């Protein structure tokens, strides 16, 4: 039976949704035969993964004026490679791959590109940049959408350039624009890249629960363990002795899970035409915004069958090479417990071949003395790699998040054990507190809502004798509602390494 804890458990777990009757309480909580403890055992191994709260609350929150879509701009780099369409000799004949060298004796010839990107007087280079530099001789002549440039070889090369270096697809970039010392004229130009406008939608969620009015003072024969949040943010273990305490806690706990799931895993329900395809009971469109994972996965995503440290290093260099300073290359990688073990084993493989690597017990404390009845000189041994320093200032630090190991939401199992999602690695450039790259969004003045409908008695608040009854039934309904959003400013600064078994 699912959720059965071996032969010592007398009954399986009982589950129900919605209104709780006296029969539920009597069957589950009220009957109290002799027990070893008056507290229920918290079963961490089944059905409830940990909340995403600690993960999402590590991001700052930014306020917006209203509930309209929120927009932001991502500006790309103006440094680009332009692929060659074709080359033509000085007579205008297309240069074939088996043709003789072109530009012999600094004779001019023509390069054709798909857009007008280069300027008069600039030196441009192809794949073999320093070997064959070319100088632009005048502005481009447009042929439809193609730009034709007259060029000559730059430098002391009089032998020309091999035709194989002038074939379609060779990529060219700008070097500089040299001029003579005296009486020089204008050359060169400046290029710009327009920002790409990004947008996301707010997600509004609700939850409700109905309780009979007579549950107001229902006590439990045994306490229900729960975790309570203090105003300081600290979590403490507590025990609910009244049924309504437990109901209130479950409402908040499950609504909190709604919120976190929407911000982390939410998917936009807008199609390519900007239309929303889902409608609520009112007939109005339901709008859901993209969560963190959907926003990051549009950028850099790699699926892997075999994990290696080189795979991870390659991913990190993609994010940092020529983009981040050497002292700004600390990456925090979110993963599960299985991913952390896999990371440790791969680092261990790498360092095990280092001849200078010595387990100096004075500094690493790999072996320590412990107390044990088994031996008078008992020792403990072990270590785990949680950080790796790669070349060029790249540092990798692991952060294990419990929701990667959640067996309820993550249903696909991995051949090596555990859920497959636990082997996922999310490399996120978080940014700074002044300019975060990932943050939660909030509408100014629009806090979460909590309201009640009730008849004669309201067991949620303890009120009795309602002179303005919402309905004649002796019950109460709690409603919770919130509008949420999350923003990843620049998804290209993030990367995900995902087990291939999770590829859809």
Curated annotation (Swiss-Prot):
The entry's keywords: Capsid protein, Virion
GO CC annotation: viral capsid
Annotated S-S bridges: none
Tree of life domain: Viruses
Subcellular location per the Swiss-Prot or TrEMBL entry: Virion
Chief location category: virion
Quaternary structure annotation from Swiss-Prot or TrEMBL: Interacts with the auxiliary capsid protein (via FD region). Interacts with the head fiber dimeric protein. Interacts with the head fiber trimeric protein. Interacts with the portal vertex auxiliary protein.
Other remarks in the entry: Displays an HK-97-like fold with an insertion domain that protrudes at the capsid surface.
Entry function: Capsid protein self-assembles to form an icosahedral capsid, with a T=9 symmetry, about 77 nm in diameter. Each asymmetric capsid nonamer is covered by 9 capsid auxiliary protein, 1 copy of the trimeric head fiber protein and 2 copies of the dimeric head fiber protein.
Protein name: Major capsid protein
Organism: Bacteroides phage crAss001 (Bacteroides phage PhiCrAss001)
